[in-house]
């Protein structure tokens, strides 16, 4: 069942995307998480959808949502592209994709695991922090081989 806020959010998101030369592919509002997660999937009809497209849409939609106050409480906005499989490397990418689902691969294994899946919290000089079902996992950067955006729910 579609969340009741999805239709007004969609009505707001479509013109925002069109102004940026993008299309809204889908919108899902996950209220079973705290804070709730608003996921907006976009595509660029002119070329492969890239990180810059997601960043531009995220900034523009966030401003529009804040101005209208459609969502009354705190939430996390995720803007992505269906099928995007992107390795995060730069500080800018880690900041832009805060709150997004990621897969962190380590070698050797960290605490007995070589792959960690969770929501990206942040990265500092020594660690990457992810939220895994409400638990903060701190993974030493020296062990990390890659951090990828994760498509899975």
From Swiss-Prot:
GO biological process terms, semicolon-separated: ribosomal small subunit assembly; translation
CDD domains according to UniProt: YlxS_C (cd01734)
Keyword check for Cytoplasm: yes
GO CC terms, sorted: cytosol
Keywords: Cytoplasm, Ribosome biogenesis
SUPFAM superfamilies per the UniProt record, alphabetical: YhbC-like, C-terminal domain, YhbC-like, N-terminal domain
Keyword presence, Cytoplasm: yes
InterPro entries tied to this protein: Ribosome_maturation_RimP, RimP_C, RimP_C_sf, RimP_N, RimP_N_sf
Listed PANTHER family: RIBOSOME MATURATION FACTOR RIMP
NCBIfam families xrefs: PRK00092.3-3
Family: Belongs to the RimP family.
Function recorded in the entry: Required for maturation of 30S ribosomal subunits.
Record's protein name: Ribosome maturation factor RimP
